């Protein structure tokens, strides 16, 4: 047992030391890569084709792009990929793939005829109408020289009626507010603006910390000599952003970058959920990170980078970490994100988030605040099968359920928690792991193990539940590879993505929580 502890601690120490380096790590994005290829490709052909080939390799067997577990997240990357690949269609197989993508979009229309759910991907009400407009514009612009094929999509707009109306409302609100650089609306700049305003460039050198928005801004700037310095900075931003992905290839872009505070606050929060923040062997690398997080937390909160506006999710994670580490924190910093009955990431949000609210409530619980008034929110949101799902920031119900159970573990709602444990029991795969795609994944198994370990420490598990926990822990041990991060995309933004270091922090925290817990018994 001591050997695995030593290995896990060494791995965790290396992870903590690297948090926030080079702006953070992020999985590659189909949407942002497609937009960069379409709107502002690198002039070097040797860099374009790796991105084209990568895009082609990401197409699913049903013809679409994106994770099949989240159908509503797939239309935007699929449309973006179609429009980008039309310009680079030199093989019959690519053309056949585009035809399949066209059929996929037709089949997907049924999802958009239903009422819109709360877990729409970020900016979907802006991005999908924008991509539909772009597709319509290109189809009726026959003189586009760099489009070798004409692929008539002929997508009916009626099924998107509710989304388009929501988008028009959102655009009008944005235009009234005239957003500043480094604010949430600018993250989706490409969907509501067309004038290359240099005032919107933030400290990263890009637009809204978004490769897609930055590529669109560069396209709009059209090599304007009066914007020479700004254009050079934005081009450098795209080069640096491409280095943040696991592909590390020019033109292959993440969905957001830089994300150092998101990576730092959420990774350290994962340690809090595992109860290992005070473990002696990590303090020399941990304390500088926590001290850095403390100085970064301002009265308005903290964002996913120092150059982006504060949000409630990163703020809740940071506050929880600092309180758990013994730092004094003014809770007004967190409470400003409360909008009855939830906590919000950004003021003016249209959909609430259960996971964000759970994290904020957990932070308040750590601070000794009476959190009983929030318990009923979680109980009312519980599904009939005992789980919590439908969150706007993560597609996995295991993520949401994990964080709600941690927020509820000191509550009197034992029946609700037992029902959630029963849901975990039902959905555990025969191999002992968990995953929403009919196979076990590391990060989702880590969520389940962390939830169960927290309930075990609260005395809420029976022998069968502990056996379930042990099977999940064994699965993590069998599939653990020291110093090698896995990539499974279940976080939700403009499209589904994976912040690798954060997921690794959850994995290591889950394994250490159980391992150290066993040593205490």
Swiss-Prot record:
<comment type="function">
    <text>Involved in the biosynthesis of (+)-O-methylkolavelool. Catalyzes the conversion of geranylgeranyl diphosphate into (+)-kolavenyl diphosphate.</text>
</comment>
<keyword id="KW-0460">Magnesium</keyword>
<feature type="short sequence motif" description="DXDD motif">
    <location>
        <begin position="311"/>
        <end position="314"/>
    </location>
</feature>
<dbReference type="InterPro" id="IPR032696">
    <property type="entry name" value="SQ_cyclase_C"/>
</dbReference>
<protein>
    <recommendedName>
        <fullName>(+)-kolavenyl diphosphate synthase</fullName>
        <ecNumber>5.5.1.29</ecNumber>
    </recommendedName>
</protein>
<comment type="similarity">
    <text>Belongs to the terpene synthase family.</text>
</comment>
<dbReference type="GO" id="GO:0010333">
    <property type="term" value="F:terpene synthase activity"/>
</dbReference>
<keyword id="KW-0456">Lyase</keyword>
<dbReference type="GO" id="GO:0000287">
    <property type="term" value="F:magnesium ion binding"/>
</dbReference>
<feature type="binding site">
    <location>
        <position position="311"/>
    </location>
    <ligand>
        <name>Mg(2+)</name>
    </ligand>
</feature>
<feature type="binding site">
    <location>
        <position position="313"/>
    </location>
    <ligand>
        <name>Mg(2+)</name>
    </ligand>
</feature>
<dbReference type="GO" id="GO:0016102">
    <property type="term" value="P:diterpenoid biosynthetic process"/>
</dbReference>
<keyword id="KW-0413">Isomerase</keyword>
<keyword id="KW-0479">Metal-binding</keyword>
<dbReference type="GO" id="GO:0106242">
    <property type="term" value="F:kolavenyl diphosphate synthase activity"/>
</dbReference>
<dbReference type="InterPro" id="IPR050148">
    <property type="entry name" value="Terpene_synthase-like"/>
</dbReference>
<dbReference type="InterPro" id="IPR008930">
    <property type="entry name" value="Terpenoid_cyclase/PrenylTrfase"/>
</dbReference>
<dbReference type="Pfam" id="PF13243">
    <property type="entry name" value="SQHop_cyclase_C"/>
</dbReference>
């Amino acid at each position: 047992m001591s050997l695995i502890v030593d290995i896990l601690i060494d791995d965790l120490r290396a992870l903590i030391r690297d948090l926030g380096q080079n702006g953070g790590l992020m999985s590659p994005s189909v949407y942002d890569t497609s937009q960069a290829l379409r709107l502002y490709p690198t002039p070097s052909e040797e860099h374009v084709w790796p991105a084209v080939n990568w895009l082609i390799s990401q197409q699913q067997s049903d013809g679409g792009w994106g994770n099949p577990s989240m159908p509503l997240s797939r239309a935007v990357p699929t449309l973006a990929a179609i429009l980008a690949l039309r310009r680079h269609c030199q093989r019959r197989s690519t053309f056949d793939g585009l035809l399949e993508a066209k059929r996929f979009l037709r089949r997907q229309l049924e999802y958009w005829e239903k009422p819109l759910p709360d877990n729409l991907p970020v900016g979907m009400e802006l991005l999908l109408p924008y991509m539909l407009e772009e597709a319509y514009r290109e189809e009726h612009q026959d003189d586009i020289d760099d489009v070798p094929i004409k692929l008539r999509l002929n997508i009916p707009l009626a099924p998107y009626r509710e989304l388009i109306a929501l988008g028009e409302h959102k655009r009008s609100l944005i235009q009234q507010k005239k957003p500043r650089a480094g604010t949430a609306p600018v993250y989706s700049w490409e969907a509501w603006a067309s004038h290359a305003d240099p005032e919107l460039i933030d400290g990263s050198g890009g637009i809204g910390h978004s490769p897609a928005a930055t590529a669109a801004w560069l396209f709009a700037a059209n090599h304007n000599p009066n914007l020479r310095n700004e254009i050079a900075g934005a081009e450098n931003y795209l080069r640096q952003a491409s280095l943040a992905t696991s592909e590390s290839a020019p033109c292959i872009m993440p969905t957001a970058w830089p994300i150092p505070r998101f990576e730092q606050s959420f990774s350290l929060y994962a340690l809090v959920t595992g109860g290992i923040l005070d473990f002696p062997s990590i303090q020399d690398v941990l304390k500088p990170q926590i001290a850095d997080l403390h100085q970064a937390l301002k009265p308005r909160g903290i964002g996913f980078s120092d150059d982006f506006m504060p949000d409630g999710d990163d703020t809740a994670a940071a506050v929880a970490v600092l309180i758990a580490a013994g730092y004094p924190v003014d809770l007004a910093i967190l409470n400003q994100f409360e909008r009855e009955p939830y906590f919000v990431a950004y003021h003016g949000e249209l959909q609430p988030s259960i996971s964000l609210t759970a994290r904020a409530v957990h932070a308040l619980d750590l601070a000794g605040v009476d959190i009983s008034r929030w318990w009923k929110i979680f109980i009312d949101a519980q599904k009939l099968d005992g789980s919590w799902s439908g969150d706007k920031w993560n597609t996995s119900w295991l993520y949401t359920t994990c964080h709600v159970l941690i927020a509820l573990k000191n509550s009197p709602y034992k029946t609700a928690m037992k029902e959630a444990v029963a849901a975990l029991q039902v959905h555990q795969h025969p191999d002992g792991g968990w995953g929403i795609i009919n196979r076990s994944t590391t990060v989702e198994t880590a969520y389940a193990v962390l939830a169960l370990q927290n309930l075990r420490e609260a005395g809420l598990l029976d022998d069968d539940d502990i056996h379930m926990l042990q099977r999940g822990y064994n699965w993590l041990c069998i599939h653990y590879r020291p110093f090698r991060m896995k990539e499974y995309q279940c976080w939700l933004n403009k499209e589904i993505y994976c912040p690798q270091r954060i997921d690794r922090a959850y994995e290591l925290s889950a394994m250490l929580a159980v391992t150290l817990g066993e040593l205490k018994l």
